Amino acid sequence: MAGNSLVLPIVLWGRKAPTHCISSILLTDDGGTIVTGCHDGQICLWDVSVELEVNPRALLFGHTASITCLSKACASGDKRYTVSASANGEMCLWDVNDGRCIEFTKLACTHTGIQFYQFSVGNQQEGRLLCHGHYPEILVVDATSLEVLYSLVSKISPDWISSMSIIRSQRTQEDTVVALSVTGILKVWIVTSEMSGMQDTEPIFEEESKPIYCQNCQSISFCAFTQRSLLVVCSKYWRVFDAGDYSLLCSGPSENGQTWTGGDFVSADKVIIWTENGQSYIYKLPASCLPASDSFRSDVGKAVENLIPPVQHSLLDQKDKELVICPPVTRFFYGCKEYLHKLLIQGDSSGRLNIWNIADIAEKQEADEGLKMTTCISLQEAFDKLKPCPAGIIDQLSVIPNSNEPLKVTASVYIPAHGRLVCGREDGSIIIVPATQTAIVQLLQGEHMLRRGWPPHRTLRGHRNKVTCLLYPHQVSARYDQRYLISGGVDFSVIIWDIFSGEMKHIFCVHGGEITQLLVPPENCSARVQHCICSVASDHSVGLLSLREKKCIMLASRHLFPIQVIKWRPSDDYLVVGCTDGSVYVWQMDTGALDRCAMGITAVEILNACDEAVPAAVDSLSHPAVNLKQAMTRRSLAALKNMAHHKLQTLATNLLASEASDKGNLPKYSHNSLMVQAIKTNLTDPDIHVLFFDVEALIIQLLTEEASRPNTALISPENLQKASGSSDKGGSFLTGKRAAVLFQQVKETIKENIKEHLLDEEEDEEEARRQSREDSDPEYRASKSKPLTLLEYNLTMDTAKLFMSCLHAWGLNEVLDEVCLDRLGMLKPHCTVSFGLLSRGGHMSLMLPGYNQAAGKLLHAKAEVGRKLPAAEGVGKGTYTVSRAVTTQHLLSIISLANTLMSMTNATFIGDHMKKGPTRPPRPGTPDLSKARDSPPPSSNIVQGQIKQAAAPVVSARSDADHSGSDSASPALPTCFLVNEGWSQLAAMHCVMLPDLLGLERFRPPLLEMLARRWQDRCLEVREAAQALLLAELRRIEQAGRKETIDTWAPYLPQYMDHVISPGVTAEAMQTMAAAPDASGPEAKVQEEEHDLVDDDITAGCLSSVPQMKKISTSYEERRKQATAIVLLGVIGAEFGAEIEPPKLLTRPRSSSQIPEGFGLTSGGSNYSLARHTCKALTYLLLQPPSPKLPPHSTIRRTATDLIGRGFTVWEPYMDVSAVLMGLLELCADAEKQLANITMGLPLSPAADSARSARHALSLIATARPPAFITTIAKEVHRHTALAANTQSQQSIHTTTLARAKGEILRVIEILIEKMPTDVVDLLVEVMDIIMYCLEGSLVKKKGLQECFPAICRFYMVSYYERSHRIAVGARHGSVALYDIRTGKCQTIHGHKGPITAVSFAPDGRYLATYSNTDSHISFWQMNTSLLGSIGMLNSAPQLRCIKTYQVPPVQPASPGSHNALKLARLIWTSNRNVILMAHDGKEHRFMV
């Protein structure tokens, strides 16, 4: 699933909450969210209400090692950004509102603390992150792009910094950074706002360095109340210093030998200090520490022993302590302006949060009396509170008698080709089950709730205890037999299963420990190894097990330490094993001999060499960087487990290498609409299952099926339901005998076509034997029926049903809900569905069950509104009130899918397997074949061809069988219409009506920028949904909102230089301007990903040649913002910038309200530079020659094309119309060829898509401003003909854009004649010039004008005489143009004062009659018919003379305006010398020459 597609995760958590061993805590500034990081690398977001009730909302995945620190990263109120750092140097910037990852980076050092520092530059607020950790300096990082800007360095005894604090000075502009090094030396740096401009310059040295003899410093904090004191907490004592000269004011020892882990000021005279076992003490400071008291600093200079000791004020402790694995984490937070609580928050290893509200400590409280805890909640408690319990993927099949906990799923693998999920459980059994069916049971209400053991499934029993890993090798590589499934367990065994028959083929017992991993060797190994799989066990051994020979061909087992990574060197026949102690063993695969063992740098080099040999280090066990995205692209999802739980460091090169290689190997459109991925947060946890729905793939599959569907009259849902008989208890739903016959027929048909490719003979005989037994023995059938039979269900429709039912906002419109249930066959969810959100680089946030419990009571102004909502109403509406990003994704998905289903015939989910028999004709393929339509294996193009031919016979076989049992009825048309109407209502509700139905205080509107990035999505349905949503949202926010949007995004609009566009600039010059600095380091990574991101290359053209004052940020987000600004401003300008005037009514005054500020051409001195800049950006993107950064058919270029077309009237004053039209013609010159070979259902190729957009833009421009289009093209034609006459340029003339785009130009002219005839007549001579250029002369001579271009012959002022091949055209200014097709010459005659109404040649070609209604004259011209003239010798132009002129009474038009003026009168020759002037009202005037 490429990053570009729209992928939505839905999570099935199961009853056991994920392990969350808390390692760091943060409370957001508004006090509304607690963020906790854990040792496994996940981050949890907890909502906090005003009453301090806490509810876990989401879990964020993305880090691959323990989280070491969290910090806020944004100061503005609406954005709530948090930055996290992990032990292996990763840093992520998260949006706390919705869990999106905004930016991420990886540094070669570990941070242990981050402080956010904000300062203002001019009127702009800038944010910096000051990081310290396992390195001897403080790094200053930009808070938005995560780039390291500069560092604070020590001259004197540099060392690691153990903690740091920023002291804000109210009096001067200088802020100081105070830090303590590990050795107890206090360092002071001065940070001024001038340094904000600094970047990559020389480091800043400290101002002061002073030993204060504080060993093992845990924390240092500055007193915000007095602005004068510093608290330093060390493991055995804590001290207060004067921040002015760092002299000691007071010291406190540790209580009964405990270790302090941190502290902070609670008020001017109290501090709170906490210990590693979770107790916290509040102390009152002596007067000598308080700047306000008279005895301040009275103790300075005394020895530590003689200082006045602080008095213990109170103790905070938990009553009933649980056993914890590691010390809890405690932090103190006090509020900002609007948030007054002082909270002490503690998190421990069981995922529990304890909160004390310290604000209400009474002065008189006795020291021994502890403070009551305010709130206490753990993840597991939050799970347990929910009714119904959070569902696991196969809970209904895992019930244990006399226990309320289902069996835990310990390993899973999904087989997309069959839509089956294989789950290994803790009792050793393995279950194979249809994934969509089992998910429907868990998430939706329906008839399935009444059936036990639904859906039909198969159980494999063979392991004696927990199953630890599963592998379906065929999915990773097509060289493996598609029947084999491999499982490993804690019983040391590896078993080969046949998934079709359910039998155990072989057991390997070669290891002496539980199996931890099963891997597939790379493609280029030796033939023998290619049929092996590699197993890794906890006894530190690695085996190569041959599936073909059913024996272990090599066992490498002398490793002294656990195995961390496995690499391959196929060219040398080596298997390389890396262990946790850093040693590397190199084994020969064929002989099983140990070639060498290496340590240290040699070991690292050996591992790196393997990476070079196999560019994608896919199979490293510990590939932490194998993130979601990669794992999903590879469809080998073993990789994901490592991401979740092997906290091991590998080199970042792996990431880049495998990224690069992935792009090449992936077959196009091999995506599956559904992927199920099991993830664990910790090794000991049961699997959590995430269902990834790929909206684009689902749309493609639905459309492909629709295209291949046979005639509906043959099989209608009604027939199927009548025919299919009653269902029985077994897995097979058709009654025995007929099913067998039918099955046989279907099978024969398919076997003919696919035998060589997919079916195994032996399995067939087995099949027949079983079939006969099933018929005779119902018991046997029930126990042995195949898990999924061919006639049972349609995977694509089931996926769509599950997805649409989860996305729909239930309960807002009861009538529509009824339609959805009864007519469309959707099902209501049991409880709120936990969705997820995928963001950059495969980071994802998953909603925790019950995330909306506290949603109504969040701490915002909306708190009151929230209280009044009834409790039950959360179900269904939840997702549109969560966050703007979630709303955007969900609305895009539901609208694009509803539109797709609406375009299909009778696409209802009713009548599937739960009723009796499927709605759809069966798909070709036996139950055991990978259903070709879902995911053809990369190599199966031939197979696909065979299957397509197989489709028709299969269907007829099926329908005959059905008709034999029922009278055939034609499908009822009304139902089809009603179904489509239902989908249409569903789409309309979500597109337009949601804000009103939900109420604005709860509805989170879609994000304009996310929609803008999909303005030209490659999937047309998603594209249309995004455009409809964006325009609906822009209308909803009205003029004020649009103005605000413009103000927000205008600063990001890149300022392109004007001369870039002028046609005179050579391509080379442009290339040099576009050349970017060499990408190195992190930039290289960004480019590496570029293709795979949400908006593949929308950012490509944007920064190439922008002369900006400030350093161009290479940050992905920066470039993305520029692209987004171009699109958003382009859309607002195009759609709301100006009303396109109907032609001829130019005088109509424009009301000022229609034009957003900055987009009008008003004379009132208004600033319209915005429209100019937007227009420059759009034309730049259209005309910039293709380069690696801006490929010829990129999304951003296509978007520019589209917006230039839509808003042409707004941009026209600022653009070089000629260059733009030529650019568009260039893009669609080969449109016919491109658009001819597209496959129904599949997205267009980029080239075809560009052509389609350019075509559309040309039509829009032409109809919006016909005169501009016609005159510009005519000018180009004249220029071109002049060039052609010049013999030197002859060679290139046929390759020019104009010559290649002749067909397109004619197409547009035809549209204009159809829609805007008045404008065409105004410029008829120019139009004729263009037509004459575009039509082949020889063709016109052969077929005549009427046949070559019939549209132009509609006009009475055009006449063609075939024998002399002449065309006469009457112009607006009273002249007549005569074209001679043979010579290509044109001659003009003047004879009238007003526009010419009609012209006509006499039948023998001697005379030409011309009539003008305005000056009421009809003239007859004698054509020169001398021999020389008619043959056209000497290219002599025919001499014309006017022989007669008659006065005619003028004809009155029927009604003013409209096209009547064009049809006033026509000339009809009755013989060679007689002509009739026929007026539109039927009056005739006869004339004779």
UniProtKB/Swiss-Prot annotation:
Encoding gene per record: Wdr7
Swiss-Prot/TrEMBL WD repeat ranges: 17-56, 62-104, 156-199, 324-366, 404-443, 462-507, 558-597, 1350-1389, 1391-1431
Region feature (Disordered): 754-783, 911-947
Organism the protein comes from: Mus musculus
Keywords annotated in UniProt: Phosphoprotein, Repeat, WD repeat
Pfam family, one: WDR72_alpha-sol
Protein name: WD repeat-containing protein 7
Biological-process GO terms, alphabetical: hematopoietic progenitor cell differentiation
Chain positions with Phosphoserine modification: 935, 1455
Biased composition, class Basic and acidic residues, residue ranges: 767-782
Gene Ontology CC entries for this record: synaptic vesicle
InterPro entries: Quinoprotein_ADH-like_sf (IPR011047), WD40/YVTN_repeat-like_dom_sf (IPR015943), WD40_repeat_CS (IPR019775), WD40_repeat_dom_sf (IPR036322), WD40_rpt (IPR001680), WDR7/72 (IPR049916)
